[in-house]
Structure formats: C-alpha cells, structure tokens
Amino acid sequence: QAQAGAVISEITEAEAGYVTSGAAAALMLGTAACVTGLDPGKMNRLPNTDGMKNEVIIPRSHRNFYDHAIRSVGVKLVEVGVSDRFSGAGVRDTEAWEIADAITNRTAAIAYIANANAHPPLMEVVDVSQKHGVPIIVDAAAQLPPASNLKKFTALGADLVCFSGGKAIRGPQASGFLCGRRDLISAAALQHLDQDTLFELWDPPRSLIDKNVLPGAPQHGIGRPCKV
C-alpha cells in the first residue's frame, strides 16, 4: 500500500494515496478517518459514534444511493438546501452559506458529489470547510476522463477525493483509490489493514502510518471487510 500510495500521490499531486476496493469503499474509509482521526479508541468503537463528531453535511441535491457507504460508518447525514432547479419549481439549489450554517461541534465532514451540474461550486464549499476546519470528502468516482481531474479536486482544496478504478481507468470493478491529506489517509489505512500484530513488533512504512504518534494499534477496523 505504501508503494502504491506513492504512485497515487504522484499522479494526483495529493499528500498521500491509498488503494481501495472501489470508490464506495473509499467513501467509507474516508468518512471513518474524518470521524476518528488517529485515535485508536475511536476506531475501535465504530460504528458506535456516541460522543464523537458523527454528522456529515451534504447538499440535498447530492444525495445518492452510494452515500450508504458514508452512513455505514455510523454517522448521520445532515441534508441542507432545497434543490428547486431539479423539481422544476424554481432555479435555486443549496448555497454555500447554508452549509456553513449547518456546521456544529458534531460535524465530522462535508460530503460533495462532483459532477458538471454540482452546486454550490466546489471552491465555495472548500472556502466554508477551511474557514470552519471541517474536512471535505469529494466523491469523484465517475469524473474520469479527463485525466486532469486526477489533480483538480485536490488542487481546489479537497481534503479527501474518492475515485473508481473500474470505470475509465479500466481496472478491476472492485478497485478504486482515496487520495488527500496524509493524516486522513493514515487514519483510513489503520481502519483497513490487518491489525493482528503486537504493537512492539509492528513496523508499518512511515510514509503510510507514523507509529510514533499512536498510543497503540487499533483492532481490526470498520473497513477491514473492504480489504484488497
């Protein structure tokens, strides 16, 4: 994973990357990472999120069948805005200020589904996320081609980006990858990899997981069923 992550990091220009068993698995692992950070105790408690940041804000027009992967972590989706433009009743959709207004001390992340019709514009949502210190997860599963999108969302300020490996990349259908902030990729990896090892003997690649910042190793994480 560390070697593959280095390749993903190079092609996406993100801090780090990680191979997953599809974009939905990337959504699940990314959400878990945003909820727990690098806290093994929180990792062990998922999907019980009592006492944690356990809400993910999503524009109402971004809801889709795949957001079940987000909810599977144990978080609640907080829908904001009204998508009048899709109902034919008007021209408005969710606006960035509505996302900001929904942020509380329970907000773990903001979910954003990238496509040509997505609203509000990603840059506006990134401004909100950075102002409030809330990570944004971009689902870019079907946003290839163009190849430039491999770098676009990270360059715009997304904390995590999920891609499918089974569409235009033409890899196995059960493949994908997650890229973004190094600390969040590490948190995702910790909840995905086999943890059946003694902490004192465990020697993960530091480029993927910095053992020195951990009080101990978590148990098998919520993402273990998504192993590759």
Located regions from the model:
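A glycine-/small-polar-enriched, mobile loop at the entrance of the PLP active site in fold-type I
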Residues: 1-2
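Conserved PLP-enzyme active-site core in the AAT-like
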Residues: 5, 13-19, 23-228
